[in-house]
């Protein structure tokens, strides 16, 4: 459990997610056990604690129906495939995986299992994007010929890049700005305007930060 996973757990136990109950959580770090023990659902039920994903899948499968994956990108495929193999639904935080091959493998496993598979792209719920989507679908914007979007709010400081050993690295994250922040923009583009027919990309390295992954996309 990391910072995002902790946030999701608190939202569920607080009753902020309708029809969802937190029945189990995987905690590998000893210092978070006390935090895990404090997780109590609104009905007074405590969440079970497992010390590894392997333990959850092997001994705890009867206590849950779905899995939320909020781990570093490169772990998504393995965890999702194990969950689908156990007949569980999967809600995976973005991105699906670190490369297209892993993402397609996850999609194939989901299809074969017949279970629900969803991705967490929270910006689709922003009121501005919901309104734009409505305007496009209703034809209020006419025949759209060109779209240009520049987003500068995702500039990350060195503190962010150093906040996790897996961040901003090919080994841990699978890339830099494009896979971390840029995917939000790419998701909104295809959600609002459909899939592109052609792509061109320019990805600078070392423009703002001294690391080997892309720091602008």
What is each PLM-predicted segment?
Residues 22, 46, 64-67, 141-144:
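Local beta-strand N-terminus motif with an aromatic residue
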Residues 53-63:
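Short amphipathic alpha-helix with an adjacent loop that forms part of the alpha/beta core around
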Residues 66, 72-73, 77-124, 139:
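Beta-strand-loop-alpha-helix segment that lines the small-molecule cofactor/substrate pocket
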Residues 123-210:
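Predominantly a Rossmann-like dinucleotide-binding segment in NAD(P)-dependent oxidoreductases
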């Amino acid at each position: 459990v990391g910072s995002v996973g902790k946030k999701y757990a608190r939202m569920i136990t607080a009753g902020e997610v309708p029809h969802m109950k937190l029945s189990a959580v995987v905690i590998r770090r000893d210092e978070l056990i006390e935090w895990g023990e404090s997780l109590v659902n609104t009905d007074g039920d405590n969440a079970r604690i497992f010390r590894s994903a392997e333990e959850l899948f092997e001994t705890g499968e009867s206590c849950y129906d779905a899995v939320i994956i909020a781990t570093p990108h490169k772990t998504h495929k393995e965890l999702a495939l194990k969950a689908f193999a156990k007949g569980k639904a999967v809600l995976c935080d973005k991105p699906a995986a670190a490369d297209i091959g892993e993402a397609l493998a996850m999609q194939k496993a989901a299809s074969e299992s017949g279970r629900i598979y969803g991705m967490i792209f929270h910006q689709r719920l922003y009121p501005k994007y919901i309104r734009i989507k409505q305007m496009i679908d209703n034809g209020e914007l006419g025949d759209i010929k060109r779209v240009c979007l520049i987003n500068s709010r995702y500039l990350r400081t060195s503190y962010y890049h150093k906040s996790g050993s897996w961040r901003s690295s090919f080994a841990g994250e699978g890339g830099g700005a494009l896979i971390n922040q840029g995917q939000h923009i790419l998701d909104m583009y295809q959600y609002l305007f459909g899939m592109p027919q052609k792509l061109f990309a320019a990805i600078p390295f070392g423009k703002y930060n001294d690391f080997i992954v892309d720091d602008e996309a």
